[in-house]
């Protein structure tokens, strides 16, 4: 420990605050304390390897005194979020979780996003993208909020969704009605769902009494569909409870999110060496998750006043319902741990089966998709520690005039690994020919990496010019099938998207006045024929700069 740091520790204040260990001006560890002097003195006699490394590496110590522990907690969270010091524990998503965002525009729009920023109101995270899509589709039919991002001041004719009855139409002056729709949506997503259910029941009963059975059936179906979408996420509780339930074991944290009696999500995170307090700071205080009124834990925390942060209660269950929720959270945690054990077992078996030197922590999978040689694309998916890492997925467009999977594989392997590091194992969807094509491509660029394939016919594992037959329930085969299915799904979805864009190009070629520049603008803005069909004349005209040509586009479509 540097002498100047020792002196600062001995002179530290008794007040609450935040301390920052730095190396060459860069924060390497940030902590908080109810009493800075007491906390910092523990660093004079390091008891763990981590603390020893911090004090040995640090050449500077900065302290910031605040009014109370709450301020210290929030400041610590904000500083860690800003600087991401290497010795602070970090929250690692084990999956991608979507959010619902209400924009901060004068007339807001609603969308599904991957990340939470400071540019609107966010709700989530949710467990499933499909669940969020289904939920928003039903809620839009009920409330009529807008989901388009168009500049409403320039629109004179409402879009397709307005004519379908799914949007109120703020673009044609229905501003107050849209404000009410957004208010209802905020209330619903905040957990206050009774208003929407009561509204649907009232409408259904009113139309039924008037013998207007067609509209009564419409509201009945909306009510049933909304209930079904919410129930698809899991258990429905008798009480209108709004809470999160947090449990953890080892480095794994699981949160059950319950809103208005509905289990709306289960999310899991890894945090190496993290405590419950660390998780609350990283997940809630830093803004990744919305703060619920109640946070159920397995036991009491320290005397920290979490109510001042927005929680009304943080602690163990107070009712049988909360006890049941805690038990459900524990079972989910056990299942997550079991799954991780099975994945690790599968990876260890894979390592033995292929006689690999290194543990296959990172596996990258490649698949080719085309239509009789046209619109050829390649997908590259990534699995780390047996789980998909979607943020590292990549797509490649391959130009060729005839179907040749081997050449396509060689092309994408050379493009990928001439610029990027090799994985521990490369997976190719296919048999011996596809595997050898990948190996040849690696040799051409002077690289070497184990390559494994999975032949489609009998789910046969292919490695080093030999076929390995495994039982259908073998953990290695199950893992490789999952990787194969994911590479195929990702490749097919990109191929479909490329094919739609090419179809759009060919249709636009027949529109007088649409040249290469306008065609490019339309494709980049709308992406598909369906999106152009549902757009207004004004929106198309704004993109290409001509109302007359925009009218021709709509006429042809």
Curated annotation (Swiss-Prot):
InterPro entries: GIY-YIG_endonuc, GIY-YIG_endonuc_sf, GIY-YIG_UvrC_Cho, RuvA_2-like, UVR_dom, UVR_dom_sf, UvrABC_protein_C, UvrC
Keyword vocabulary terms for this entry: Cytoplasm, DNA damage, DNA excision, DNA repair, Excision nuclease, SOS response
Pfam family, one: UVR
One BP annotation, GO: SOS response
Organism encoding this protein: Thermotoga sp. (strain RQ2)
Gene expressing this chain: uvrC
UniProt xrefs under Gene3D superfamilies: 5' to 3' exonuclease, C-terminal subdomain (1.10.150.20), GIY-YIG endonuclease (3.40.1440.10), UVR domain (4.10.860.10), UvrC, RNAse H endonuclease domain (3.30.420.340)
Compartments where found: Cytoplasm
Name used for this protein in its record: UvrABC system protein C
């Amino acid at each position: 420990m540097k002498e100047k740091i020792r002196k600062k520790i001995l002179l530290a204040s008794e007040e609450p605050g935040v301390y920052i260990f730095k190396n060459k001006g860069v924060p390497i560890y940030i902590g908080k304390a109810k009493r800075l002097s007491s906390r910092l003195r523990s660093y004079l006699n390091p008891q763990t390897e981590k603390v020893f490394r911090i004090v040995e590496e640090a050449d500077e110590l900065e302290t910031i005194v605040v009014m109370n522990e709450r301020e210290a907690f929030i400041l610590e969270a904000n500083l860690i979020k800003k600087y991401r010091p290497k010795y602070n524990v970090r929250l690692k998503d084990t999956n991608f979780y979507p959010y619902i965002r209400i924009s901060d525009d004068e007339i807001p729009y609603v969308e599904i996003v991957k990340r939470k920023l400071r540019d609107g109101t966010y709700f989530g995270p949710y467990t499933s993208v499909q669940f969020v899509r289904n939920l928003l589709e039903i809620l839009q039919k009920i409330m009529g909020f807008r989901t388009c991002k168009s500049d409403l001041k320039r629109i004179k004719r409402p879009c397709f969704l307005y004519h379908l009855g799914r949007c109120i139409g703020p673009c044609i002056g229905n501003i107050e009605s849209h404000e009410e729709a957004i208010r209802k949506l905020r209330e619903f997503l905040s957990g206050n769902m009774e208003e929407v259910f009561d509204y649907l029941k009232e409408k259904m009963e009113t139309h039924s009494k008037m013998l207007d059975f067609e509209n009564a059936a419409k509201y009945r179906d909306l009510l049933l569909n909304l209930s079904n979408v919410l129930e698809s996420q899991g258990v429905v509780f008798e009480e209108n409870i709004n809470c999160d339930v947090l449990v953890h074991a080892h480095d794994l944290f699981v949160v059950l999110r319950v809103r208005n009696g509905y289990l709306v999500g289960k999310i899991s995170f890894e945090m190496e060496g993290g405590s419950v307090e660390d998780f609350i700071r990283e997940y809630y205080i830093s803004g990744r998750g919305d703060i619920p009124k109640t946070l159920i834990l397995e036991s009491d925390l320290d005397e920290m006043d979490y109510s001042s942060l927005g929680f009304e209660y943080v602690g163990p269950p107070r009712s049988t319902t909360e006890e049941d929720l805690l038990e459900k959270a524990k079972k989910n945690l056990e299942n997550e741990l079991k799954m991780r054990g099975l994945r690790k077992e599968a990876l260890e078996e894979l390592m033995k089966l292929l006689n690999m030197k290194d543990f296959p922590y990172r596996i990258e999978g490649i698949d080719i998709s085309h239509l009789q040689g046209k619109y050829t694309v390649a997908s590259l998916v990534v699995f780390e520690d047996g789980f998909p890492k979607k943020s590292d997925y990549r797509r490649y467009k391959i130009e060729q005039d005839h179907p040749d999977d081997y050449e396509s594989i060689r092309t994408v392997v050379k493009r990928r690994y001439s610029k990027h590091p090799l994985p521990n194992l490369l997976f190719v969807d296919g048999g011996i020919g596809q595997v050898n094509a990948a190996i040849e491509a690696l040799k051409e660029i002077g690289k070497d990496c184990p390559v494994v394939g999975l032949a489609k016919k009998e789910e046969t594992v292919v490695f080093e010019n030999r076929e390995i037959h495994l039982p259908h329930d073998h953990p290695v085969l199950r893992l490789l099938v999952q990787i194969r299915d994911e590479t195929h799904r990702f490749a097919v979805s990109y191929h479909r998207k490329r094919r739609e864009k090419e179809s759009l190009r060919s249709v636009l070629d027949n529109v007088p006045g649409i040249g290469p520049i306008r065609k490019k603008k339309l494709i980049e803005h709308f992406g598909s024929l369906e999106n152009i069909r549902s757009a207004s004349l004004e929106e198309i005209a704004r993109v290409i700069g001509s109302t007359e040509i925009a009218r021709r586009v709509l006429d042809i479509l």
